Amino acid sequence: MSELRLCCDLLVQQVDKTKEVTTTGVSNSEEGIDVGTLLKSTCNTFLKTLEECMQIANAAFTSELLYHTPPGSPQLAMLKSSKMKHPIIPIHNSLERQTELSTCENGSLNMEINGEEEILMKNKNSLYLKSAEIDCSISSEENTDDNITVQGEIMKEDRMENLKNHDNNLSQSGSDSSCSPECLWEEGKEVIPTFFSTMNTSFSDIELLEDSGIPTEAFLASCCAVVPVLDKLGPTVFAPVKMDLVENIKKVNQKYITNKEEFTTLQKIVLHEVEADVAQVRNSATEALLWLKRGLKFLKGFLTEVKNGEKDIQTALNNAYGKTLRQHHGWVVRGVFALALRATPSYEDFVAALTVKEGDHRKEAFSIGMQRDLSLYLPAMKKQMAILDAL
């Protein structure tokens, strides 16, 4: 990549020199310098280096790496991309639709990633150039297995009940001429679930503890639950962002499981590392939480654009990126993002991927349901981000 950058700089210099010669009419041939030959040589080197970079990129995104499952990987709560020809993956079954709360023997947040990807994650801090096979599950001690599963189901049932109450309230206010279009919800009309209403754990489920403490386990579970949104944009398009989110979730959880009794909130984890003078150490939980927050803000910004009526997914993503992650990325990462934007799906395909039942996106009730769900989900997400900003 450094060679490519060098070629770019040389090209700029030599093009400027050529323009200068053309304008002044003065040639450097007396000095033995043929600007045209130099420019041609640099162009050839640039194209050759660019071709090598593309070969490396293609090798990184081969289907073998994207879909290889490590031997013995757990099958619960798999956040992965299906081997479908279509880049958008509708969530037609529970494994694709949600991140389940389950347990493992050491009570950790499992994220199974193949060896090739592990090497990349060790060499990159905040962006990774491969997709992953991820097992994302939050758990407690072995004797609370059933409780966690039940709690996840209760949270989902409570959310569905809240949605029905929300719809009834909208119905009652439907006669108000100043009511927004989504308020025009007629009683008895079909209620269609969406990706956001069927999450096992959502940011809207989080109950803050004393002093606005964000419960660590519930927060990490909510983060895992929203990661599949990136899959709805295509299995490889935003693999780098997905890998970044997943790795940072894992780092925070690794800190959490070292002392669950003490690190009940995110604030306590940060305070502990600040007092130990390790908060700014590479791969610390505090650093991971910082990048996790940035990634979540990007997702929130994108979903807000969609909720506000932006029908061009590329524009929605670009606007969200410009307001959040772009300022933290160098020119190389920005270039990768620009390339990823070219492969984004249409609005119709993206919305179709957020359905629970195939074909629901064609119904008017689904659009109303999306507005309803995002109206509950995004403010809750914003609240968590505001608390993290204050840390």
Curated annotation (Swiss-Prot):
Disulfide bridges in this chain: none
Gene3D superfamilies registered for this protein in UniProt: Glycolipid transfer protein (1.10.3520.10)
SUPFAM superfamilies assigned to the protein according to its UniProt record, in alphabetical order: Glycolipid transfer protein, GLTP
Protein name: Putative protein PLEKHA9
Cellular component GO terms held in the UniProt record: cytosol
Gene name as annotated: PLEKHA8P1
GO MF annotation terms: ceramide 1-phosphate binding; ceramide 1-phosphate transfer activity
GO biological process: ceramide transport; intermembrane lipid transfer
PANTHER family, A to Z: GLYCOLIPID TRANSFER PROTEIN-RELATED, PROTEIN PLEKHA9-RELATED
InterPro entries for this protein: GLTP_sf, Glycolipid_transfer_prot_dom
